[in-house]
Design a protein with these regions (language model features):
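Short beta-strand elements of extracellular/lumenal beta-sandwich folds
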Residues: 58-74, 592-602
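Terminal connector regions
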Residues: 142-181, 564, 648-708
Length: 724
């Protein structure tokens, strides 16, 4: 296929014996002219509606059609469009990225020839804001295509602008793979994650209708399932078990948070149908597996830890047990919903990187496969092309590292809001894989490449994704392979080094302040669980809700995560408040020590065992030992008496604090007032003694004054008597 004679007229063959760039005769023969000068800015936008075929062959016809839109404020006259193409194929993937980012600058234009025979007149005068349709068609045999590879392709718009000259008024570049049937194909593993934002409260109420709408016809998850169901042998299923669980919940009827209240959702039937279709699609994939598949009677589905937990952030905050719980419970939840065993648990690292501590924890909890970015484990030799499998070392042994190709995942994340964007994304994806197939040498230990999104919450355009999957196995440079196929390879075939996990990766995690709030709710749950005689069926729903609050999804929507944490905390506090002390008012002790009666109520539907303690304010004025092992049946009250000693004569404010069996505070304390009659009697004696003292002083004073008055009167009488 590298010989031009296979695709151009015989009288042109001689012209292409020498390279295109130095063959001016060849340019004339093809009706091609050098690239036109580029204006200061593009004024006409090119919107592509169609580009066929995906992989052109000799005798095919290349067709490109679309619209031209005048985005300027002036009229563009004599508008035409024509096709341009590079003289030689791209040889490196970096060139694809470079070409995609280039401006329409003639000094750096990668397009060498513009084919005049493709020129079509579009509009005599394209007014501002107006659009006009165009279609370019050319036999593939007439294209100046040389050796196999990816060629830069361009639709150039010409017209008369303000300067009065025919100049380039706009254009769009894309890629044209030109690969022979004897191409050395790569094996493409398509990872197909199904997950969504787990915004479900502990009581099952949804914070919003995002998931029900996504499961309904036309929704994101509905589209992903439809595409996968059409390509059961080409994709590798991965799902968050929480999504399967919530889909089942929705199918059984659901409520949605609506301000302070709730409303009944009406998309239950759609959720049930989605689950049924998923089961059928998984059965189809299982039926197409090779007879010697290791999956046995398991579904060809791997699951992430429950709610796609952000293991890095959670581990950093010391909540290791939550990571272990979300990992170990994942497969059983999925199997329960799907009524059949699944093919194990893996961890899809948010952001594509994993620190050593988190890797060790995952390995210790039974995870044997992690999904990372390619540069998380780059080849030790910089000249080696990275393929799809490596080994991630941990303290507990090596884990399979599935390495998603960064170029492909970045391409899948390109804008796809229009048909034109979808086509450009599709062509770039095909270009990336075609160049890869040429770069991987025959002696490489692997030709498997992993394609997948940058995160599990992807939202691709269905049409373009369908076309890409259709191309896998039909274009000559792409064969399909499964994740199971990949995992049978030697994961140490390419020597690798471990990439870093630096400040940028840490900053992308759930924030430490957020995880601290989650930790606070976990402590609430631990306290509540401690007093329940039988926590089964109550605390597990809160434990799952707390795991949902630790999802990596909240990296993308932190406000929704905060709302979920708050709702769980409020609901849990309401449960805690159903076990409480009824005591209030003033209690008088018959002496400085006495018994304080306390009534404890249990409004829960199951028995609890608590302790209780009196605490004075200030504490130094009250001496009291806690009382433990108080069991209260559901819906009942129990009265107990606590011995207490009040120090001092004033009324003492005290709290009646319930305790967990291990002595931790439970709930909020009730407030009472304590006073002692012993101090009241003492005060009365003091007052009586003081009164008697005062009376004595008064009597003595009066007596003294009377005596003094009498003495003075006698003295005066003696002075007035005559001397004899």
């Amino acid at each position: 296929m590298v010989f031009l004679g296979e695709r151009i007229p015989p009288w042109h063959r001689l012209l292409f014996v020498i390279p295109f760039l130095v063959s001016s005769l060849g340019l004339i023969g093809l009706g091609a002219t050098p690239a036109a000068a580029d204006p200061a800015g593009s004024v006409v936008a090119v919107v592509i509606d169609r580009l066929t075929p995906l992989a052109p062959r000799p005798n095919d016809t290349l067709r490109i059609s679309g619209k031209l839109l005048n985005t300027s404020s002036t009229t563009v006259n004599r508008v035409s469009a024509r096709l341009g193409i590079a003289a030689s194929p791209l040889t490196e993937r970096a060139q694809i990225t470079k070409v995609s980012g280039l401006e329409l600058n003639p000094e750096i234009d990668p397009v060498d020839y513009f084919l005049n025979q493709t020129k079509v007149d579009v509009s005599d005068a394209l007014q501002p804001g107006d659009e006009a349709s165009f279609e370019i068609a050319i036999p593939v045999n007439d294209l100046p295509l040389g050796r196999d590879g990816v060629y830069t392709l361009m639709v150039e718009v010409l017209g008369v602008g303000g300067a009065g000259n025919i100049d380039r008024q706009g254009g769009v570049r894309t890629f044209l793979p030109w690969m022979g049937r004897d191409s050395n194909a790569i094996n493409l593993v398509w990872l197909w994650p199904l997950a969504d934002y787990p915004a479900q409260e502990a009581n099952g109420v949804l914070l919003n209708e995002r998931i029900p709408r996504s499961l309904a016809p036309g929704g994101r998850l509905d589209s992903l399932l439809n595409i996968a169901a059409k390509n059961p042998i080409k994709i590798s299923w991965i799902a968050d078990p929480q999504l399967l669980q919530i889909a089942q919940d929705i199918a059984g009827g659901y409520q949605v948070r609506n301000g302070d209240g709730t409303s009944v959702g009406d998309l239950s039937q759609d959720a049930g149908q989605w689950l049924a279709r998923l089961r059928r699609a998984l059965d189809s994939s299982a039926a197409l597996q090779p007879e010697n598949s290791a999956a046995g009677d398991r579904l060809p589905l791997r699951v992430t830890p429950y709610a796609d937990i952000d293991a890095g952030a959670v581990t950093r905050s010391g909540l290791d047990s939550d990571v272990v719980r979300s990992t170990t419970m994942a497969a059983s939840i999925a199997s329960t919903v799907l009524q059949q065993s699944v093919n194990g648990t893996l961890y899809w690292a948010p952001g594509g990187r994993l620190n050593k501590r988190t890797g060790d924890l995952l390995a210790s909890s039974g995870v044997r496969t992690v999904i990372l970015r390619g540069d998380a484990l780059p080849p030790s030799n910089a000249n080696t092309i990275s393929t799809g499998l490596g080994v991630l070392g941990t303290t507990y042994g090596g884990m399979n590292a599935v390495l998603v190709d960064q170029g492909l995942s970045a391409t899948l994340s390109l804008p796809q809001s229009s048909t034109s964007n979808e086509i450009l994304m599709r062509q770039r994806f095909l270009a990336e894989t075609a160049v890869l197939s040429q770069l991987i040498t025959d002696d490489s230990p692997s030709r498997m490449i992993v394609a997948g999104p940058q995160d599990v919450y992807w939202d691709p355009a269905p049409d373009s994704l369908n076309e890409l999957l259709d191309s896998t196995g039909t274009v000559p440079w792409l064969n399909s392979a499964s994740l199971s196929d990949l995992l049978t390879e030697n994961n140490a075939g390419i020597p690798r080094k471990r990439g870093g996990y630096g400040p940028k990766a840490q900053a992308a995690e759930l924030s430490s302040s957020y995880v601290q709030k989650v930790q606070g709710v976990s402590e609430q749950l631990a306290s509540f669980t401690a007093v329940l005689d039988n926590p089964s069926g109550v605390t597990d729903v809160y434990a799952e809700a707390i795991l949902r609050a630790q999802s990596s999804a909240w990296r993308l929507e932190p406000a929704a995560g905060e709302e979920l944490v708050t709702s769980i905390s409020i609901s849990l506090q309401e449960k805690i408040n159903m076990v409480f002390a009824l005591s209030e008012g003033t209690i008088t002790l018959s002496g400085e020590s006495g018994l304080v009666p306390v009534t404890i109520a249990n409004d829960l539907d199951r028995s609890v065992t608590v302790g209780v303690q009196l605490r004075g304010t200030p504490r130094a004025r009250l001496e009291s030992e806690p009382l433990y092992d108080i069991t209260i049946e559901p819906g009942k009250k129990v009265s107990v008496e606590i011995k207490a000693t009040v120090i001092g004569g004033r009324t003492l404010s005290a709290g009646v604090q319930l305790l967990t069996p291990d002595g931790q505070d439970f709930g909020s304390p009730a407030r009472i007032e304590l006073e002692s009659t012993a101090y009241a009697r003492a005060a009365a004696w003091v007052i009586g003694a003081a009164f008697l003292a005062i009376v004595s002083f008064v009597v003595v004073g009066i007596t003294r004054r009377v005596h003094q008055a009498a003495t003075g009167s006698r003295s005066n009488s003696q002075k007035n008597e005559p001397h004899v």
